[in-house]
Every structure is written in structure tokens, then in C-alpha cells.
A protein has these predicted regions:
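Short, strongly hydrophobic alpha-helical membrane anchors
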Residues: 1-18
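Membrane-interfacial, low-structure loops and terminal tails that flank and connect transmembrane helices
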Residues: 40-74, 132-151
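Membrane helical hairpin/interfacial module
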Residues: 103, 109-154
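Alpha-helical transmembrane segments
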Residues: 26-31, 76-88, 154-162
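Membrane-interface helix-loop-helix junctions at boundaries between adjacent transmembrane segments
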Residues: 104-106, 139-156, 166-196
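Hydrophobic cores of alpha-helical transmembrane segments in multi-pass inner/ER membrane proteins
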Residues: 23-40, 111-129, 188-196
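Transmembrane alpha-helix boundary signature
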Residues: 43, 94-98, 122-141, 166-176
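C-terminal ends of transmembrane alpha-helices
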Residues: 2-6, 83-99, 159-176
Length: 196
């Protein structure tokens, strides 16, 4: 991807627009899928925006997949998260090979990685909200929310993966650039995403 951006702009590293293209494309595709699922979901009396919209998307997923909406939302959001984080990771490796160490923290590849990791965490949150709105009976009750048992490890993995991102910047400032991917902070992010 970086090579294509470099060729398109005629400069090393490509233009800012070219480097944001993969993430932007994924977000547009995500928005289209969410809109289609919302359209496919059945509205219910008493749906309140924006939570009602999330519940309606869950109904669309139930209608499409046959599994409970809260589980389908968590699975779908997690798969999207892994795709975005994977594209960000791939782009980041290419960036570092071509350009070396970043001058700033929020490059397009880093933003893709962080967005993917945040989406893992949001999968647990969305799954919990839809389970609560749908009246799911199994799981842990916390402050009026019904947290399905499977959302607990998903949320913990999401928190671990997201927390690795700021710690990685501190690590690089303290110890410099890693020669390999196997620093503790990289492993925290990679393992959090992988076990999702």
C-alpha cells in the first residue's frame, strides 16, 4: 500500500490523502454495512435513538444470521476491528521499512491500528448494550446492564490491547526503536487483538 501511495504522489511515503485511503475505504464499507443492517432490522415500539438504532442493527443481524443480535454485533464488530487493525499493522510495517521511525504518533497506519483496537473494545460495549435492551437473562448484572459472559473476556482483551498503544509510545521514548515486533507493548496489542 505504501508503495502504491509513493508511486501515486511521486514522493517518498506518499501524500497524506493516499496513506489514509485504506482506512477511509474500510470505514465507508463499514457504514454501508451498518446502514443495510439497520434497514433490515425491524423497528420496535419504544426504540430510542441512538440505542434504538443499535438494537435495530442487532435485529437485522439476527434476521440475517439467526443468532442473537448482541452476539452477532460483537462478532461482526470484532471481525471488522481485526481487519482495520491488520491493515493498519501491515501499513505500519511498510511505513517503518520505507521511512524509519515516525516523527509523530498519529500517522495513518497508527490511527488504523488504534481504531481497530478501539473497535474490539466497542464490540464488547455494543454487545452488552444490545443484550441489555433485548432483555438477555444470562450474564453478570452491573449497574442496570446485563453483561453476557462472553463480553467479559472480549472487553478485557479490548482494554489490554488499547492500553498497549500509549504504553508503546512511552516504551519507544525510553528505549528507542525496537529491532523486532516482540516488545512487551507490541505483544500486548498483538495478543489482545489475536485472542479476540
Amino acid at each position: 500500500m505504501l508503495v502504491l501511495a509513493t508511486e501515486a504522489s511521486g514522493t517518498l511515503g506518499g501524500s497524506a490523502l493516499a496513506s489514509w485511503t485504506p482506512i477511509t475505504t474500510l470505514l465507508v464499507a463499514y457504514a454501508v454495512v451498518v446502514a443495510l443492517l439497520w434497514w433490515r432490522g425491524e423497528p420496535a415500539d419504544g426504540d430510542k435513538a441512538p440505542l434504538g438504532a443499535l438494537q435495530r442493527i442487532g435485529r437485522g443481524l439476527t434476521r440475517t444470521t439467526g443468532i442473537p443480535g448482541w452476539a452477532a454485533i460483537a462478532i461482526g464488530q470484532s471481525l471488522f476491528a481485526l481487519l482495520v487493525a491488520g491493515v493498519g499493522f501491515y501499513s505500519d510495517v511498510a511505513w517503518h521499512i520505507a521511512l524509519g521511525r515516525d516523527e509523530q504518533l498519529f500517522t495513518a497506519p497508527h490511527a488504523g491500528i488504534l481504531l481497530g483496537l478501539l473497535c474490539i473494545l466497542s464490540a464488547a460495549v455494543f454487545g452488552t448494550i444490545v443484550a441489555t435492551l433485548d432483555g438477555w437473562e444470562r450474564g453478570w448484572r452491573v449497574a442496570g446492564f446485563r453483561v453476557p459472559w462472553s463480553m467479559l473476556p472480549l472487553g478485557a482483551l479490548g482494554i489490554g490491547a488499547v492500553s498497549g498503544f500509549p504504553m508503546d509510545e512511552v516504551w519507544h521514548q525510553a528505549f528507542g526503536v525496537d529491532v523486532t515486533m516482540w516488545s512487551p507493548t507490541h505483544m500486548l496489542m498483538i495478543m489482545g487483538a489475536s485472542f479476540t
